Every structure is written in C-alpha cells, then in structure tokens.
C-alpha cells in the first residue's frame, strides 16, 4: 500500500487509453466472449443503418488471416471535418470515445450501438483497423494501428457510385487471450439477427471453410424465429402475435406454448439481444398475467374470490420472442454491454399493447383460451399438491437425501463456497482415484455411480426419483427450478469429469441438459466446467522422462522430441493413478477446463430439444460426429 498518496498518483488517460487499460469495462471480458463482442459492435452499427431504412444488405467476412470485415450499403459515415475535434468525422468516430451519430436523434431515431463508443472501442482493442467509406461519389479510407493510432488520416482514394461503410479489423493479441474467431458463433448470431428484420439480406462468408458461408433472409420476421426455436417441440397452442407502437416505442412479439417444462424468453432492444431481460420482459409478464387472470374471472373459469394465477403457473412450456424499438433519446441499459434494458417507458408500452391484443385473441378464440387456462389450473393444482407433499415428507426426504449422499460425497475441508469446487466424476473407480488425488482443502468429489436420467424426457416429479440427480441437487445446495437460488450455491466451480469416449460425452450431455433446464443460471454465471483429461501418456524408452498429450497434434510433437518411446492411450479416468489424475486434470495450475456458456439461447434450445429428444440415434450420431474428446486450441 502507498502511504504518501498525492498528486502524482492521479493518472489522466488520453484518447483510447482507458479502453486498453480496462477493456472489461467496455466489452465485458477479454476472453472469447469479449473477442466476439468486437464483431457484434461493428455488426450492430451496420444494423443501425438498416433500422433507419438506409441499408438492405450487410456482409460479414471471416478472412484467412484472422481478420473480420463488416460491410453495409447504408449512407456511409460522413467524411467532412468535425468542428469539435478538427479531425475528419470518420477519424473522430474511430478515435474519440463517445463520438458518433447516435447522440443526435436527427441522424438515428433508434440504434443498437454501444452508447457511442462501439466503433472507437473496436479500434482501441485492435492491432490494425481499416475503414473504407463510399459516399457522395467518392471512396475514402483511414488506417489505424496499435490500438487506434492514426497511420493514415482519412483521404480520398478513388471515385465510387456506391454508398456504405466497410470496416476490417485484426484483434490485438496483447489484449485478448485468444484471437481466433469462432465462425459457428458468428454465423448463429447473424442468423438470429436476420429474424428481426423482414427482408434484410445478411451474408456470412468464411474464407477458411467456404461450406459455412450462408445468406440469411427472413420473410416472416420473428414469427419465423419462434417457429425455428420450437421446431423440434410439440406445440400445444397457436403462435399468438402482438404488435404495435405506443409513445414512439415499437413493439413486435409472439409467443407459443409447447409440451416442454421450461420457459424461454428471447428479447431484443433496438436489435441487440438483452440476455438478462429488463423492462420489456417485465412488461410482457405483467400484462400476460393480468390479462389471463382478468379473462379467467370474467368468464368464470376461475373463482372470483381466488387470488388467481401467479407467473410460475403460466411460464411452463412458454416460448417468447420479443423485440422493441426505442427512441435513442430515452433508451437506457444497465451497464455498457446492453444485456439488460432499463427504460421504464418500454414496460408500459409492451404491457398496453399485449393486454389489448391478448384479450382480443382470447375472446375471439375461446376454445383455445379455455384449453390454455385449464392447463394453467392443472399446473397450479399440481404445484400446490407437490408443496403439501413436500411439507408432509420433508423429514423423510431429508433423511433419504442424507442416506443417498452418505458414502458418496467426499466434502472439502474448508467451508468457503467462493474457494471450493466439486468434481462430478463418472464411475466409482475414477471417483476413488479422484478422492486420493484431490486437494482436500477445497476440492469435493461426487462419484456418479448409476445412470443419470435424461431430463428432457422426464417430468420434474420423476426426475427427483433419480438418485444421481438427487445427489447433485443436495450437494450444490441451491435448489432447482422455481426454488433455485444461486446465493446458496456451495461451490464456485462445478467440474464435470468423465472418460474421453462416447459414454463419457453422453454423460456430459445429460448433465449439461439438467443444468440448462433446471439450474440455467449456473451456466449463465460461468459456474459449470468440463475437465479435459489427457488422451495419451508418452514415455521415453531410454530415460525416465514422460509427458501427457491432450490431442494427436501434441502427441506428434512429443514423438519427434522423444525419438524412442512408448505410447499409452487412456480409455478411462480409472487408468490413471491419483498422482497422474491430479497433475493432468485436477491441479488448478496445470489442468485444462472448458467453461460452459450459452452464447445463443435459440440455438441452445434447439440443440437441447434435438439431442435429448426421443430419437436416441440422433444423439449418438451427433456425439460421434462432433465430439473429438480433445482440447480446443
């Protein structure tokens, strides 16, 4: 600690230095998620041109050299001099924080750009960035390097009959842990965005793998999106759309019920996904609940004296897509990265539009309305019965849970959830080795002896009869479903450790499906990991040297290094002794973990429904084709 705190300790960061000093404040993180956030920022800027009716085509290219190019056929960034900075407007937008057209509602009525810092933040975190503008009969270009330093100020490089903006950037390897873009992630995001704009042509080109290249045009907008999300589920209601505007806020939404037990709400504000929800989702829930209760009482489908339904009665099997367009002057988010919408006027707008249109739908489709309300009543009754049964058998269940855990869980010695981690280990054999090899201070071991149930094909009451699932719920301590509370979680890391084979991959998929359906926040908060065990041990014949390889590439390197050698292929965790398991898979300073995340809710929903549905052959084929049981570089 510095004792003589004085004037010299006050730093004034100039230009784009604040972004490079604290990138997490602007893009959330410097991992894979943060890296791709740069693409989303430039893409969102292009989408803003479409939002305002100035562009009908956007192209994103993943180049062989690792760079990304985003092109739109919008108006093109103005090329004249900016009076406030004495730089060209293009150079101002890309080198000055909080500069851009989004602050003037005459230029953009609505936008999704990151509070006027998106373009400059991408530049700040790139080793090189080139902007090309087609506007007013000319072609103009600016070049920046090493975090936004102007190498070539904007200059005219030719004539042009086109209009629009082209941005190419190379991420800075001194900022990001990994600068390899995931083309599948980019493609999924572009596909998702295409549903928000009827007729907008979005093109993805991958020069490294041309087969991934695809053009997206959605003719039916978000109705098409909801059909896409629910394609592999059994629907039990029509798709119910609602659309309108109130106080210059435009609302476009639709919802449907399926036979799935979980709730899915996918929401957007000015075309940007709001993964943490916010005021628009709150307005939807409020209006949905009030309208269903009012209609039910009006037509005596429930007793007027009854307090009615609550949200937990309505959310089972509900899929929603909700998009709002909010005037730039009133839009507000919680934080820079726009994951949660804050604007309270949006809640009012969504509620008013949905209330009016949903009530009209229910009155015009009374058979459908009655079917839905009967469903809500059954869910409510089942929930109340389950609550009574839970109270009556609380002691018995507690005793049973303790018996299930007894002899299974090997707890950590310390009790600090922020430091403790739990390994969910496939089989008794590996579980025993893990117990011997672990660090007893902070590592707990839970062997999974029996079969983990497929939660996608089981209802909650059946799920709770499975001893493996009960063990996991009891160990984690945070509850499931409506009773989930992450504050009660006993471990900051939940690590799935299975054999590197098809059976091991199947167990991983089953466990991840369980977490996704009933403890999704664990994944959203980055608490779930997959341990990567080595595939090979290579030993030199002429010495005591040995090493481990996680894939064939590493094995080939070691073969070249060792000359004369023996190779052991690990078929299961149990083939390693406790010291080897600790060194390769459990030691925090050496192990390799994959953090499980949900980048795209719609894709996750579709894949879970497909993989864990009734057709086991689909699941088996997917595992065989997509899981290579080695670390992703």
From Swiss-Prot:
Site (Interaction with DNA): 451, 454, 506, 619
GO cellular component, one term: chromosome
Catalysed conversion reaction: ATP-dependent breakage, passage and rejoining of double-stranded DNA
Residues annotated as binding Mg(2+) 2: 499, 501
Residues that bind Mg(2+) 1: 426, 499
Keyword list, A-Z: ATP-binding, DNA-binding, Isomerase, Magnesium, Metal-binding, Nucleotide-binding, Topoisomerase
Keyword Isomerase assigned: yes
PANTHER family (alphabetical): DNA GYRASE/TOPOISOMERASE SUBUNIT B, DNA TOPOISOMERASE 4 SUBUNIT B
Subunit structure as annotated in this protein's UniProt entry: Heterotetramer composed of ParC and ParE.
The protein, known as: DNA topoisomerase 4 subunit B
Underlying gene: parE
